Amino acid sequence: MRHTLLLPTLFLPIVLSAQYGTFDKKAVATAKGTATIILQDAGDSPYNRELMNAVKANWKFTNSTDFGIITDLVSAPMDPAKTYLMKLRRSDAEKHDATFLALVQGWKMKKGETLKVENNAVTNVPEGQEIASIMVDAKLLDNGGASMLNVYVKNLQDYLKQVETGKITDKTTADRLYASRNRLVKDMALWVAKDQLDNSLADLAAIQVIYKQPVKLMDYSQLMAAAAKGQPDVALADVVITGDYKTKWCFRRVFNASTGELMYLRDEPALFEKKMGFIDKDLRILEQSR
C-alpha cells in the first residue's frame, strides 16, 4: 500500500517568507524518486516558454519530467507517485497575498476533494505537500521577467540539496545559511536594475557611497540576459512586491546567477510607496558582511 506523504509538523507557512519548504530529509528523498510534472499556464505565455527552457536546461532533482497544464488539476487527481512543479497562491490572516513557484508532492486525494485554480495558480494545496517554494511576481514573469525562471528553478534545487545534506533543518538554520552567503556577494559583481531601487537611492553614485564593491546599475532587460545565461560571478538583485495599500510588502533578494543560490534575503512593509525596492540598509548589510 502506498502511503500519502504529509509533512505538517516540518513545514513552515510561507506566505510572508520568500524561500522555505520542508525541513524533512526523508520527504526530499521521497520526492527525488518521483517523476515530476511541470504544470504550465493555460494558453501560450512567456512564462510557459521560459519555464520549459529552464527545466530542460537546469532541472536535475528528479530523473523524469513531463509537461502538463495547470487547469488539468481541476479534473484529474494528484498522483502520490509524482511531484508537481506549479504556481501556488496563498493568503495569510493579515490578507497578504503571494504567488510561489513550488515543488509539490502528490497525494491520494479524498473523495470529493478538488483543487482550485485561479489565474493559473492553485489556491488550496495543503501546506504539508509543498517540498520547496520560491516567491515570484507572476505579472512580471509574463512582462519581461520570465528569464528569472532559470534562476528560480536552480534555486529550488539548491534548497532541496541543503535539506538533503542536513545543512537546513529548520527556519533558523535556513536563515543562518542565507546570511552566511551575504559576504560572498562582495566577491562577485552585483547587478541591479534601475527599477529595483527605492526612490531613496537615486542612481549608481548613491549606491557607491555605501557599497564599495563591484556593482552595475542597468535596465531590467540587461539583468534578464544574465539570468537567462546563468552568468558566472554575477549576483542578481530581485524584488517582489505583494499586497496593496495597507498590506503592501517588499521582498528583496540577491541570487547567484549561475547556481541559483539565495545570497541575501530581507523583507519589510512598503507603505505609502516607501521602501519599494533596495534601500541603503540592504547595501550596508552587504558591505559590512564578514
Regions found by a protein language model. Name each.
Residues A42-F61, K194-P214:
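Short, charged N-terminal beta->alpha structural module
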Residues M1-K26:
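Bacterial Sec-dependent N-terminal signal peptides
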